[in-house]
């Protein structure tokens, strides 16, 4: 099984790093909101717009993959997520954060969609279950 995962190691490492980054961002956000004395409603809105962004992103995935391909789409989504994270660190306005969280939701779900689509496309039927099993272990360990 480990030999079957060899070609997928970079994608699995990327998934691990992305999920760890999302976990850190989701943990730091409430702490920053508390430091800014933001209300519970603002915290709820920030969470809501993130998942709204994920819903929007699912509608864009097919178009993005068809237009750009897996490698370019993944690189663009990870870069855009990084830019949003850096902007959130520089700007201390929860209302601006809502726009950034909306965008991060879109970019995150698109990156996940690209990874899973690529794993599905690149793996043969005989090892697909093992590949996706390893992917899910990596995602849940992060």
Language model: regions and residue ranges:
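Helix-loop boundary and gating motifs at the non-cytosolic
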Residues: 2-51
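Short hydrophobic/small-residue motifs within alpha-helical transmembrane segments
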Residues: 51-52, 140-141
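Helix-to-loop junctions at the C-terminal end of transmembrane segments
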Residues: 57-69
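Helix-breaking motifs and short loop linkers at transmembrane-helix boundaries and internal kinks
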Residues: 69, 90-92
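MFS-fold secondary transporters
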Residues: 84-88, 104
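Paired small-residue
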Residues: 95-103
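Intracellular juxtamembrane helix-capping segments at the cytosolic ends
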Residues: 110-123
């Amino acid at each position: 099984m480990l030999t079957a995962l060899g070609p997928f190691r970079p994608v699995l490492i990327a998934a691990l790093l992305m999920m760890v980054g999302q976990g850190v961002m989701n943990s730091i956000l409430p702490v920053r909101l508390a430091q800014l004395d933001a209300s519970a409603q603002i915290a709820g809105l920030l969470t809501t717009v993130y998942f709204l962004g994920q819903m929007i992103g699912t509608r864009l995935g097919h178009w993005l993959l068809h237009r750009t391909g897996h490698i370019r789409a993944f690189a663009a989504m990870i870069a855009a997520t990084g830019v949003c994270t850096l902007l959130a660190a520089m700007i201390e306005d929860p209302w601006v954060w809502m726009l950034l969280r909306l965008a991060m939701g879109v970019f995150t779900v698109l990156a996940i969609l690209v990874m899973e689509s690529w794993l599905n496309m690149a793996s043969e039927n005989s090892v697909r279950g093992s590949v996706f099993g390893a992917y899910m272990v990596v995602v849940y360990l992060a």
